[in-house]
């Protein structure tokens, strides 16, 4: 795998990973695709594609933030699962949420493992990671979110969750392996179409993402450290810390925002982002 940091000195690498950490934190939990922005921002700044390993490792900051933010929810889920095993109380909301999280994680684990085993290097250089592909995907996902916002009945709450909900949203999460889709965007869109209230859909999306993002970050951490070997681990540490702080702020803001507002802001942003990227690419012809 090419070393995207080979031409960067220590401070340049620190600055790059600080920016990537901020971008990661802002975009991981908003339905606008962190992968797209982590690919596009370095290209626009002439840093080159940092690669899957570096971006996945920086996502560890986001997972620290989401675990810390939802620590009480996760503790309740663990207690609910424990009670269910001891007393057979599988219909309790906390136990059902735990089951939904487990069921929803299986599809992306299976597909992600298949990619890692059989298409790892090809995925890094895939046309799916090109600027025009990301632009088109962003536009398509904006239109799907618009349909979900317009048509979703918004009746379900998190306390209504079932294993079936976990499977539906988990299958949508698999789409996030396509650069530009947005894990948060695909799961939020599926949840809205399935009748969830906005804030509860976002909350479930965040909780469902914890296992997948954690495993991806840990798996790629070794390669990420190797990719930044010339500059040492400091740049990656800075990126992870920045992602942690900004992710916490983004989670808190989005949950409060969706209690009072619709997702049309994100539909508009994704459309403009996609169209803007296509316009930029048509002028510069960059990939």
Swiss-Prot record:
Disulfide bonds: none annotated. One of its GO terms (molecular function) is undecaprenyl-diphosphatase activity. Signal peptide: none annotated. The chain crosses the membrane at residues 50-70, 99-119, 128-148, 206-226, 231-251, 263-283. One of its GO terms (biological process) is response to antibiotic. GO terms for cellular component: plasma membrane. It is found in: Cell inner membrane. It catalyses: di-trans,octa-cis-undecaprenyl diphosphate + H2O = di-trans,octa-cis-undecaprenyl phosphate + phosphate + H(+). HAMAP family: Undec_diphosphatase (MF_01006). Catalyzes the dephosphorylation of undecaprenyl diphosphate (UPP). Confers resistance to bacitracin. NCBIfam families: PRK00281.2-5 (NF001394), undec_PP_bacA (TIGR00753). Belongs to the UppP family. This is Undecaprenyl-diphosphatase. The gene is uppP.
């Amino acid at each position: 795998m090419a070393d995207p940091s080979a031409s960067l000195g220590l401070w340049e690498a620190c600055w790059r990973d600080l920016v990537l950490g901020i971008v990661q934190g802002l975009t991981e939990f908003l339905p606008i695709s962190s992968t797209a922005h982590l690919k596009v921002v370095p290209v626009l700044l002439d840093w080159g594609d940092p690669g899957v390993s570096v971006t996945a490792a920086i996502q560890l900051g986001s997972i620290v933030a989401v675990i810390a933010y939802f620590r009480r929810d996760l503790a309740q889920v663990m207690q609910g699962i424990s009670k269910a095993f001891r007393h057979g109380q599988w219909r309790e909301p906390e136990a059902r949420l735990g089951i939904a999280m487990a069921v929803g994680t299986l599809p992306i684990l299976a597909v992600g493992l298949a990619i890692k085993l059989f298409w790892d290097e090809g995925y890094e250089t895939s046309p799916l990671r090109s600027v025009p592909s990301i632009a088109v995907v962003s536009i398509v996902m904006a239109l799907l979110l618009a349909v979900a916002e317009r048509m979703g009945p918004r009746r379900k709450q998190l306390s209504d969750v079932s294993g079936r909900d976990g499977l539906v949203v988990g299958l949508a999460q698999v789409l996030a392996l396509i650069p530009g889709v947005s894990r948060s965007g695909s799961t939020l869109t599926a949840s809205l179409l399935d009748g969830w209230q906005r804030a509860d859909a976002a909350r479930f999306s965040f909780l469902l993402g914890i296992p997948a993002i954690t495993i991806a970050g840990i798996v790629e951490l070794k390669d990420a450290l190797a990719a930044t070997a010339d500059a040492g681990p400091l740049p990656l540490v800075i990126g992870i810390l920045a992602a942690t702080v900004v992710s916490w702020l983004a989670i808190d803001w989005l949950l409060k925002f969706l209690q009072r507002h619709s997702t049309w802001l994100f539909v508009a942003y994704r459309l403009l982002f996609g169209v803007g990227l296509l316009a930029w690419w048509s002028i510069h012809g960059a990939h």
